[in-house]
Amino acid sequence: ARNLCMILDARTGQPYYDLSEILKDKNYYILTTNQDKQFTRLFPEEKISAIQGDWRYFQCSSRCHDGLYDSVETLHKLNDAIDSDLRVPTDMIPRCPKCGAEMEPWVRSWVFLEGRKYREEHSKLNAFLQKNIHKKILFLELGVGRMTPMFIQEPFWNLTYAYPDAFYITINPKDALLPEKLKNKGLAIREDIAKVLADTKKFSGGKM
């Protein structure tokens, strides 16, 4: 609970504000594997797909039903109740209202619930892609590493290759990779993301 409260209460980083300014008045969509509140504080929920879950929700650990529950208030109550031995009263442990199993944060794990909310996140993204398939589209990849390239990086590569007027930009100080097949449709920027976004906002007036 303490760790999750630190994550959920963390101040929004400046790069998120800069990105928000850059994208203002543009036709955009955000695909993220981040599970915190950084994006949802600044961008409308309908323009975000959090495909790896969200710390703001609980699910049943046994996945007995397709339901998600707000976790924020409960997490703060648990955090306040932690004693000097780092324990909380047993009766405060959140339990499933259906089967009584312990509740689990709705984030990627062995028991991650890929139910209605999960499908909605993918449906929103797919609807945006289909609507814009024949338009000029920029796939901007920010900070994707080599641990889970299958969620954002590889789909962006495939979509850039397939879409006629697509272009791909990856910004990463270490893992900015550009496939050979995208050498004429992409750009790898091996720089600090915060600096690139700040410079983009400063020198282009938010235009990108």
Regions found by a protein language model. Name each.
Residues 1-208:
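Conserved catalytic alpha/beta core of Sir2/sirtuin-type deacylases, generalized to analogous enzyme cores
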